[in-house]
Design a protein with these regions (language model features):
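Short C-terminal tail/terminal secondary-structure segment
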Residues: 73, 124, 184, 212-225
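Active-site helix of classical SDR
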Residues: 99, 135, 143
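Substrate-binding pocket helix/loop in short-chain dehydrogenase/reductase
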Residues: 74-76, 83-85, 114, 181
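Alpha-helical segment proximal to the catalytic Tyr-Lys
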Residues: 104, 148-152
Length: 225
């Protein structure tokens, strides 16, 4: 059956790799991004814009929430309030906005797949990255709650928790922080966006039928629980 997916943050990094991987599976993909080259141009923090796009997009079967920012790199006591709030606005409120806009249509049709991009930082906490770590912990909790709420509807919601992935977003990660978190990976390398996209593609497919509200680590062995 033909499926349609919306991938937020779909113009770069994990989002772009996921869009390409889903297209290879025959999925019609609409990228949602602030980039003017995206299929759907919007800021995920703007709930009105997201709702308008959802209303105009037609039937959407798959939602991948990949839009995100690293936020401030500093000890918690030096983090500016606006940096904290912006990180939560994009990473958490953006995920909330898109889920709220697209999930009702999936419920009505009795089938859907939602994959939220969290981070291993949301489980372990990265030093000097408290806004990012806390925001990704919130994405994990949101996904667990949503998965339970949808469990009998045919719509499945899961999260992936990558370790460091080679993406443009990590250009905003301080070199000391990047070296520290890369050193925690037993495989001794960063991941590739295409590797994460393989996992996401499975979570978006008909092949995955008995998992919801789960968190899938893709961390090169870093995960501690």
């Amino acid at each position: 059956m033909a499926r349609t997916a919306v991938v937020t943050g779909g113009m770069s990094g994990i989002g772009a790799a996921t869009a390409a991987r889903l297209r290879a599976d025959g999925v019609t993909v609409l990228t949602l991004d602030i980039s003017p080259e995206a299929d759907l141009v919007a800021d995920v923090t703007d709930s009105g814009a997201v709702r308008a796009i959802a209303a105009a997009a037609g039937e959407v079967d798959v939602l991948v929430n990949s839009a995100g920012i690293v936020g401030p790199n500093a000890p918690l006591w030096e983090v500016p309030a606006d940096g904290w709030e912006r990180t939560f606005a994009v990473n958490v409120r953006g995920t909330f906005n898109t889920c709220q806009a697209f999930v009702p249509g999936m419920i009505a049709r009795g089938w859907g797949r939602i994959v939220n991009i969290a981070s291993i930082a949301g489980k372990d906490g990265n030093p000097n990255m408290s806004p990012y770590s806390a925001s990704k912990a919130a994405v994990i909790a949101l996904t667990k709650s949503l998965g339970k709420e949808l469990a009998t509807t045919g719509v499945l919601a899961n999260a992936v928790a990558p370790a460091v992935i080679e993406t443009p977003m990590n250009a905003d990660t301080g070199p000391d922080a990047l070296a520290h978190i890369t050193g925690l990976i037993p495989m001794r390398r960063v991941g590739q966006a295409s590797e994460v996209a393989e996992l996401i593609a499975w979570l978006c497919s008909d092949r995955m039928t008995f998992s919801t509200g789960a968190v899938y680590d893709i961390s090169g062995g870093r995960a501690t629980y």
